[in-house]
Amino acid sequence: MPANTSAAIARSCEFSQYLHRLLTARPEERQRLEQSLHHPFSLEDMQAFADWPALDAPEALAPALRRLRQAVVARLICRDLESLATLDEVVSTISQLAEFAVRQALACAAASLPQYGRPIGEDSGEPQQLIVIGMGKLGGGELNVSSDIDLIFIYPEGGETDGARKISNHEYFTQVGKRLIALLNDATADGQVFRVDMRLRPYGDSGPLVMSFAALENYLLSQGREWERYAWIKAKAITGDADGLAQLVRPFVYRKYLDYNAYGAMRGLHAQIRREVARRDMADNIKLGPGGIREAEFIAQVFQLIRGGRDRTLQLRGTRATLERLAALRLLEPAAVAELQASYAFLRNLEHRLQYLDDQQTQTLPEAPETRQKIAASMGHADWPAFLDALNEVRRKVSRHFEQVFILPSEDSASHPLSELWLDVAEQSPETRLAELGYADPAAVARQLTGLAQSQRYLQMPLAGRKQLDALMPALIEVAARFPNADDTLSRIIGLMEAISRRASYLALLTEYPQTLQRLASLYSSSAWVSAYLSRHPILLDELLDARMLYAAPDWPLLAAQLETQLAQADGDVEAKMDALRHFQHAQTFRLVAQDLAGMWTLEALSDELSRLADLVLAAAVRHAWRDIPSRHCETPRFAVIGYGKLGGKELGYASDLDIIFLYDDEHPDAPDLYSRLARKLSTWLTSATAAGVLYDIDLRLRPNGSSGLLVSSISAFRQYQENQAWVWEHQALTRARFVAGDAGIGSQFEAERHAILTLERDPAKLRDEVMAMRQRMLDSHPAHDGDVKNARGGIIDIEFIVQYLILAHAKTLPALTGNTGNIALLAVAAEAGLIDRRLAEDARAAYRLYRRLQHSARLNDRKTVEVDESLRTAYARGRELWRQVFEQALDFS
């Protein structure tokens, strides 16, 4: 044996009375430790420790498990104290031991009841197995070396056993559970394997020892409490049907919506712990005391409770893994997470050293000077004061981060200077005070406030929700008054409050994060469309929390990867995938509109971003809708989405429809049917109104033969149609078409066909007549008036028709016109080639930009028309002048 190994064991014994006693009493254990100290205790080592299958009697298994535990703990103590093991190794090894022991004990307990036979499910007719659930640190794989283990026993179905002596499955599993507990928990001459705590089961000590899936589901739905959601985060099925358990428990723990009420629930649980700590004078408890282990765990778990239902990557059991995920999602600053990780590791290492002393489950600092010195030295400090300084600094850091996350908002509605105005709005006349605040029509504002305060919606709110709204309203009245259009701003905010009054989680969000109120009011002041959008999708309030994320330019490759992760998590659940697409699209749209209102985008750049968003969403929808098609003959569909109109021309607005068609290129005999099913499914995914709303409205009428044509065409049929049957207006539409999503090979074929069609030689006079006739038909159905920049003479459609005519008439000799670069750029190409007057082209470009800006502004403020002023009239005149040059003068531009 190397001298350094012997010295390491001797040093470890100085810090652990338990290890010293064990090695003195069991020389063979010292020998084993000397031979294996430099190797972790693996699962394979545990399996090889004894001939476990032969130990099928409780009296044989019990001592073997206890000796295994002694060997594992002895090696862990030495490896940890000698810095040979990381914290990960310590907690994962002891957790692995607990799971191994549970499985061995369960097998032995079941084998000891042969007279009953097998438990058979009354519904399935299949043999049943006890599901042993590890809770707490065992479930999280972060068990303490001297910890007890929290277990819950569940079985899938009722029924009875099939042996000579029949008993109910409930009775059978109760007996199995009792025997399992005894095998692990009973104190013998060899000690215990693990103390077993069953108090986390439904109804606690007063509840049945075992429970069926159905009974557990009923309990969680009808009686499950908030603290139990916290507890079940870490639940892990050590044996049995893990998937069945997860499907049952996940909806209880992780809500579909963002659950900001979790803050209040966790605060309540923390306050209860603090009261218990104070009552029992436990300030020196590094787990439950201020700045202790539990506070670090709460920080991780509150984000899981709030967001885990929406983001399954947060459905983790371990504290440290969860903290890392929070940093990756930027829910906590990476620097804060690094500090929390280091603090948590310090506290867990300290916890282990306290337990190494005498193999006791303790988290309390010692009082004896000699023991204090041992702890200080084992933590790498010269003396107790130096160690205490380090510990106090760690606890201060944890407390600071805890307070930052759980900062207590003011829910005392009487504390705000305007509280009396809101709380007594129906009994007094607040007009004078509202006028002083800056409201233009205080009487109308007072009527709105009174209407809300006297509405059945408000009066029927639960007390907790009404208290939150009462706390919010004075602050909202104050913040809305800071904006020039204060009356409209507050009116829109009141509409939001009415929309979310039954959604306590959203009220909790605004209460927990009062800094969001200014951002909310700013957006509501700027745009009626945004106000309506947010009221329809209040889940987007979450986007207001982090201004850096809200105003960060989109990183589309990163966002695409995040969306793919969310869709993969919902694999097999079509509704969840449809909602994931909607949540993603709504969130990105909301971020873009916030950035737009902040002046971060030109209109052309904004349209590019909205088009990239649509492209990304369509690509993801195609991939995942195809996976939902049964009997498909290939993994990747030979199918493409082609965008027309505003999508094709990259001129999308916030509420634009998507003009699209579907093409395929596949010789398989089932291809027409499969791709028709895909097209129908994709249309459903895009347009169906789910709980999360609608993704996009789509228009499929530009496909070959329009509404009477096939929903999806082969690329060869599309080519034949375009070359032989398409009308001129369909070729006009093709000028703004592009490949958007799906098979890039089909996209290339489409682009080649588009180029071929656009560069056909045409009779300019005949083309002119057909284009002008089409424009007249549009005017007949949508008469021109100057407040409508789209249909007005000299407006958007006229300029678009000019560009389309120039492309179809001259692309054969000027192929640059086939580039899908937008109307403004194509006007410049035409002018450069001498097809149109340069001055008129530049005027038309400026006019087109003006029209789009006015149209965009009108839509943001829910106006159907624009204000007609001299600059707009001048723009129309320039557009009409270009129209006359192109269509009413000689068409020979050579």
Swiss-Prot record:
Cofactor(s) needed: Mg(2+)
Reaction equation(s) it catalyzes: [glutamine synthetase]-O(4)-(5'-adenylyl)-L-tyrosine + phosphate = [glutamine synthetase]-L-tyrosine + ADP; [glutamine synthetase]-L-tyrosine + ATP = [glutamine synthetase]-O(4)-(5'-adenylyl)-L-tyrosine + diphosphate
GO molecular function list: [glutamate-ammonia-ligase] adenylyltransferase activity; [glutamine synthetase]-adenylyl-L-tyrosine phosphorylase activity; ATP binding; magnesium ion binding
Keyword ATP-binding: yes
Keyword match ATP-binding: yes
Region (Adenylyl removase): 1-410
Domain of life: Bacteria
Gene Ontology CC annotations of this record: cytosol
UniProt keywords, alphabetically: ATP-binding, Magnesium, Multifunctional enzyme, Nucleotide-binding, Nucleotidyltransferase, Transferase
E.C. number: 2.7.7.89, 2.7.7.42
Sequence similarity: Belongs to the GlnE family.
Record-given protein name: Bifunctional glutamine synthetase adenylyltransferase/adenylyl-removing enzyme
Source lineage: Bacteria, Pseudomonadati, Pseudomonadota, Betaproteobacteria, Neisseriales
